[in-house]
Curated annotation (Swiss-Prot):
GO molecular function list: ATP binding; proton-transporting ATP synthase activity, rotational mechanism; proton-transporting ATPase activity, rotational mechanism
Main enzyme class: translocase
Identification of the protein by name: V-type ATP synthase alpha chain
Catalytic activity: ATP + H2O + 4 H(+)(in) = ADP + phosphate + 5 H(+)(out)
GO CC annotations, alphabetized: proton-transporting ATP synthase complex
Length: 579
């Protein structure tokens, strides 16, 4: 089916003569066959958002409908790849066309020439259905790739073709003539089905103490990370990609500056995976849409990333989907909405911004897959609020749809406190659900310690305001002890070095032991001050400096060091009280 162009407005064009077309159908626009998607239908007229630059299009040029929705290719070869927002392989396109891509450039997302050794797990006569395991695809230098039956497919196996196969060649034939290849296609806007959702009672461990202990998120949960320029969003996301409890990382760079994306593309291949010792990129899929790329492709990029994440989830993997940033995605949505002449909402964003964000974040979750395995997609969405204003619409809509806020503070970043997570603003809605896991796995009393630490930090904020007015020396020893204990907690526990091998990640058991010792120091020093021991004498023991060095110790050495420090603390305080 084909029509003709009758109207153009930036990336949005209108074609007539497409009476049989459907919503979200992919079309090819103009003589250069630019990729587009139908977003509105009125009679035989279709409004199309074009995923490439539309300059030079002329009225009357042909528009050809494909009969298919916008879909991604899923199969062996995804890991380690870099795509744009509509899953065009950027490295292959750069090799063919140079650093600047021409319009209409198109290549299959997965390499059709590469052969994979297919080791089948089914035999003729077996009955298979969606989610069932077909086998494993292997290739030199690539991780093993589990091949599963696409959702909605059911049948009895009539023939199995093992051995060297390309991704588009039939590997399993079913009765009735249906064929299954290593490759499948899936519409990006349609969530992949699962057998059932599982309760969110297992944490998504990030390796960052401030997140895991104070603001945990469940596996399959959602978190929003608002932060202005220079607050460390990219470094935090790299730390999460490297140390978080995820088998696969899908990183979506949505509308960020080209220089920042170039830096990410340059640094990610050099990051070492601590699990395997190989490059981190080997278990990462990157989707890159810089701010100078067409806004329509920016809008589609987060759905492309989500479809890929759900595909790996259906293999029984834990997937971390990181979007940087949803603000740029919302700005693309605002621009497209304005081109469509829709009624604007707050700050010009479309009125359906909240429902679109909620529908997207609802695709996260920990599930039992159709094949009976357990998989999860955990979403971490960065937000770039103008001027750090958390009351703007994108941040507020994200907060209503997600389970945690990890707010990054410019003030902490300027003080070189990383991760610059502001504990006075951040929150989690899942702390109570995950408390049982931390009590079992980290240590009994974990929740009580966390609450005590947060009260200490809150008390420090109150006293800091008083100290600014009257000076620290005017405070009583008990109040100055609160300031000192909170300083030790901030610098020795909440702050973490991404460059220190022992401190870059922290298991829950180490974090529990550290937190218990910090708070024990505060309580026992408080008792000594109450008994008349001068605070200066307690500080002169040097035990505070030893507390700060706990973070630099490997996890296995922390219990012994903590026991020695606890004994020295008892001895020092007993001596001071006896004097």
């Amino acid at each position: 089916m084909s029509g003709t162009l009758m109207r153009m407005a930036g990336p949005t064009v209108v074609a007539e003569g497409l009476s049989g077309a459907s919503l979200n159908e992919v079309v090819r626009v103009g003589e250069e066959r630019l990729l587009g998607e139908i977003i509105r239908i009125e009679g035989d007229r279709a409004t199309i958002q074009v995923y490439e630059e539309t300059a030079g299009l002329a009225l009357g040029e042909p528009v050809e409908a494909s009969g298919e929705p916008l879909a991604v290719e899923l199969g062996p070869g995804l890991l380690g790849s870099v795509f744009d927002g509509v899953q065009r392989p950027l490295s292959e396109l750069a090799a063919r066309e140079g650093d600047f891509l021409g319009r209409g450039a198109s290549l299959p997302a997965l390499d059709r020439a590469r052969a994979w050794e297919f080791e089948p797990a089914v035999a003729p006569g077996d009955r298979v259905e969606g989610g069932a395991r077909l086998g494993v695809a292997r290739a030199p230098g690539a991780p093993d790739h589990l091949v599963v039956v696409p959702p909605g497919v059911t049948g009895r196996v009539s023939e199995v073709r093992g051995g060297a196969r390309r991704v588009d060649e039939p590997a399993v034939l079913l009765d009735g003539g249906a064929t299954l290849a290593l490759l499948e296609r899936w519409p990006v806007r349609r969530p992949r089905p699962a057998r059932r959702r599982l309760p969110p009672d297992v944490p998504f461990l990030t390796g960052q103490r401030v997140l895991d202990c104070f603001f945990p998120v469940s596996a399959g949960g959602t978190a929003v990370v608002p932060g202005g320029f220079g607050t460390g969003k990219t470094v935090l996301e790299q730390s999460l990609a490297k140390w978080a409890a995820a088998d696969v990382v899908v990183y979506v760079g949505c509308g960020e500056r080209g220089n920042e994306m170039s830096e990410v593309l340059d640094e990610f291949p050099r990051l070492e995976d601590p699990r395997t010792g190989g490059p981190l990129l080997a278990r990462t899929v990157m989707i890159v849409n810089t701010s100078n790329m067409p806004v329509a492709a920016r809008e589609a990029s987060i759905y492309t990333g989500c479809a890929i994440a759900e595909y790996f989830r259906d293999m029984g993997r834990s997937v971390a989907l990181m979007i940087d940033s949803t603000s740029r995605w919302a700005e693309a949505l605002r621009e497209i909405s304005a081109r469509l002449e829709e009624m604007p909402g707050e700050e010009g964003y479309p009125t359906y911004l909240a429902s679109r964000l909620a529908r997207f974040y609802e695709r996260a979750g920990r599930v039992e897959t159709l094949g009976g395995a357990e998989g999860a997609v955990t979403m971490v969405g960065a937000v770039s609020p103008p001027g750090g204003d958390l009351s703007e619409p994108v941040t507020q809509c994200s907060l209503r749809a997600t389970g945690a806020l990890w707010a990054l503070s410019a003030d902490l970043a300027h003080r070189r406190h990383y991760p610059a997570v502001d504990w006075s603003v951040s929150f989690t809605l899942e702390g109570d659900r995950l408390a049982g896991w931390f009590e079992r796995e980290a240590g009994d009393g974990f929740g009580a310690l966390r609450d005590e630490a947060r009260k200490l930090l809150q008390r420090e904020r109150e006293l800091a305001e008083v100290a600014e007015l009257v000076g620290t020396e005017s405070l009583q020893d008990a109040e100055r002890l609160v300031l000192e204990s909170a300083r030790l907690l901030r610098e020795g526990f909440l702050r973490q070095s991404a460059l220190d091998p022992a401190d870059a990640t922290c298991p829950p058991a180490k974090a529990f032991e550290m937190l218990r010792l910090f708070l024990e120091w505060h309580r026992r020093a408080g008792a000594a001050v109450g008994a008349g021991v001068p605070l200066r004498s307690i500080l002169d023991t040097g035990l505070g400096a030893r507390l700060l060095r706990l973070a630099q110790l490997p996890a296995a050495e922390v219990p012994g060091a903590a026991a020695a420090l606890r004994a020295d603390l008892s001895e020092a305080l007993a001596r001071l009280e006896a004097e």
